[in-house]
Amino acid sequence: KHGLISMKDNADINHLENERKRIASLDSETNNIHRILEDITELLDAIKSLGTPQFTRQARMAFMAKSFCSSLVEAGWFTNDEIEEFMKSINTVSSKFDYDFHKFSLGLMSRNEFNKIYGHLRSGTYDIRTDSYNQMVFRPVTEKNKNYKDKNVSKGLDENRLKEALTSIGFDIHPKEFNNFLVSAIEGREFLKFEFIIIERR
């Protein structure tokens, strides 16, 4: 069910981006201040219906997923290291950013290529007064011996132990399905945040 919800939320975000492009195109053809204000109001309404609820929902799902992981550690089913390795195996926007930043640092990706994907982001903050990456002047240095790899599909937590843990609290769900929820919830929140910020910045 969460997968279907995520698909619907992603579709809504894509619809919102199309609405933004349509409104921006109309505004580029007029100097009428009243028309522009009407279009701004229309875009804000679209964000309220096609963006904010979707991002909020995905953020809550990710919070639940991380809380479940913390509970699995507290109950002794998994160690902190195992959960940390599981988190690292998830192919999020953040992990892709680290990989591409490393490529940029080694000269394997141009500044224009990097900015095209990540230029709208701000370094570790929501503060709108902070410059985004495409406004910053920097020459990154990275650890050349650090091993960065493209990630494959996450294998998830050990299903046998996870099944015992779920059974112990009366959760009637297959461990594979639960693993899929954990991964998709964490990936989905980051993806939607990334796409939502692109729309806001444009």
Regions found by a protein language model. Give the residues of each.
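Contiguous hydrophobic, helix-prone segments at protein termini
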Residues: 1-202
